[in-house]
Design a protein with these regions (language model features):
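Glycine-rich phosphate/diphosphate-binding loop of Rossmann-like nucleotide-binding domains
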Residues: 77, 82-102, 154, 160, ...
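Terminal amphipathic helices with adjacent charged low-complexity linkers/tails
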Residues: 146, 154, 223, 387-417, ...
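Long, charged amphipathic helices and adjacent flexible linkers at domain junctions
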Residues: 408-436
Length: 470
């Protein structure tokens, strides 16, 4: 990854139109008639329809594709409590990712308050405007309370990405890492470093994936979360308190199969890594610098699967693989919530996609680096366009099956095609060609069957059900 200098970042944000986002028109406004339709008197007609049937807001307004990114700036990634205004570039950046990866529109809303009840009151009042709420960079434990209260009363999805985004991606990585090393999820010992929003949520999600609660140990700045501990405790930590003699991270790491870090740089030593079980799995997800660097971890031992939050190392656990596609699926079925079933579906979709052959277009986007399921490739890459198709479809399906979808999708194959069409006419044309090929199958012979490109092309033909091997 190229070095990003301070001035580069400042120039990027200040050159030309300031910031990173704008509002674009979706209807023509070139004539007097256009303006009369867009505003008065024509606008009165959709208003009347929505008054008679509130769900028509999804038909006549942008509500169904609009998400609020809400923050008070109390836990901004790598910067801490910098306040609402200073956190605005991050929230605009979140909007960029929503649009780039899932074609979702965003208004960023920065709230100048530390009062969780005031945040709850304001966000509740915004429900008519948005199809979903993404809570961002709000410190723990207030973030748990805010999300819980909003989910109780709002009829649109509310999602705290700092909690659940990390868990989905790391959960997918965990499933694949365990498969590679041949360990069963209900047998492994897992140690968490960090008991904030991401740490607590990760621990809960790993249990839903199959980790035994008694095999999970939570460690914070005060040490191991054990039964009877008084210092630095809250109800969310109490849930994970266990009977143990371990008191430090070093104690907890002895014999551990998995380390999941969402804490701070450098808390894991080489000696701790050496004390873990064979074929250890280390997810050092602290940003911007991991709990231990891959260089130090592999210097301690070679039988590792290592993931970090950084793009300059293999196996980047990046939230951008989660929230855009999760919301895409949720919005497209008019979901009333993002529930555990949808999050699990997203994790399983990512896990399965990582085992598929990687297209040339993705390889080129990452400089031609070989990407094949294994220790250095346990989760898909963010620029893989298939993530949208796999994850959003899985989420939409889970929403329907779990009863939170207000607008079920009858044909999921057609839905996948519609997702592709969001990102350009060339993909629409390709889908038409694929459909025609399916309707009139031909016998195809590849004389260069030993070539890697031909093998990949053959796999795509098989996946698209254009032809079957003889």
């Amino acid at each position: 990854m190229a070095m990003i200098r301070k001035q580069d970042a400042l120039d990027y944000h200040s050159t030309g139109r300031k910031g990173k986002i704008e509002i674009a028109l979706t209807k023509p406004c070139a004539t007097q008639r256009d303006l009369s339709l867009a505003y008065t008197p024509g606008v009165a007609e959709p208003c009347r329809e929505i008054y008679a049937n509130p769900e028509d807001a999804y038909k006549y307004t942008a509500k169904g594709n609009l998400v609020a990114v809400v923050s008070n700036g109390t836990a901004v990634l790598g910067l801490g409590d910098i306040g609402a205004l200073a956190g605005k570039p991050v929230m605009e950046g979140k909007g960029v990712l929503f649009k780039r990866f899932a074609d979702i529109d965003v208004f960023d809303i920065e709230l100048d308050t530390h009062d969780p009840d005031e945040i709850i009151r304001i966000v509740k009042a915004l429900e008519p405007t948005f199809g979903g709420i993404n809570l961002e960079d709000i410190k723990a434990p207030e973030c748990f309370y805010i999300e819980e209260e909003l989910k109780k009363t709002m009829k649109i999805p509310v999602f705290h990405d700092d909690q659940h985004g990390t868990v989905i991606i790391s959960g997918a990585g965990l499933l694949n890492a365990l498969e590679i090393v041949g360990k069963k999820i209900d047998h492994v010992k897992v140690v968490f470093s960090g008991a904030g929003a991401a740490g607590i949520a990760c621990a809960k999600f790993y249990i839903k994936l199959g980790v035994k609660r008694e095999n999970l140990m939570l460690v914070d700045t005060k040490g191991v979360v054990y039964k009877g501990r008084k210092e630095g405790m809250n109800p969310y930590k109490e849930y994970f308190a266990i009977d143990t003699n371990a008191r430090t991270l070093a104690d907890a790491m002895k014999g551990a199969d998995v380390f999941a870090g969402v804490s701070v740089k450098g808390v894991v030593t080489k000696e701790m890594v050496k004390s873990m079980a064979h074929d250890a799995i280390i997810f050092a997800m602290a940003n911007p610098d991991p709990e231990i660097t891959p260089e130090d971890a592999f210097d301690a031992r070679k039988d590792l699967i290592m993931a970090t939050g950084r793009s300059d190392y293999p196996n980047q656990i990046n939230n951008v693989l989660g929230f855009p596609f999760l919301f895409r699926g949720a919005l497209d079925v008019m979901a009333t919530a993002i529930n555990d079933e949808m999050k699990l579906a997203a994790a399983y979709a990512l896990s399965t996609l990582a085992k598929e052959d990687v297209p040339d277009s993705v390889l080129k986007a990452y400089g031609g680096v070989r990407l094949k399921f294994g220790r250095d490739y346990i989760i898909p890459k963010p620029l893989d366009p298939r993530v949208l198709l796999w994850e959003a479809t899985a989420v939409a399906k889970a929403a329907m099956e779990s009863g939170v979808a207000r607008k079920p999708i009858a044909d999921l194959d057609a839905y996948r095609d519609s997702l592709e069409s969001r990102f350009g006419r060339s993909k629409q044309i390709m889908r038409v060609l694929i459909h025609k090929a399916r309707e009139a199958p031909k016998r195809i012979v590849f004389p260069e069957g030993q070539e890697e490109k031909i093998l990949r092309a053959s796999q795509i033909i098989l996946d698209e059900e254009i032809a079957m091997p003889i």
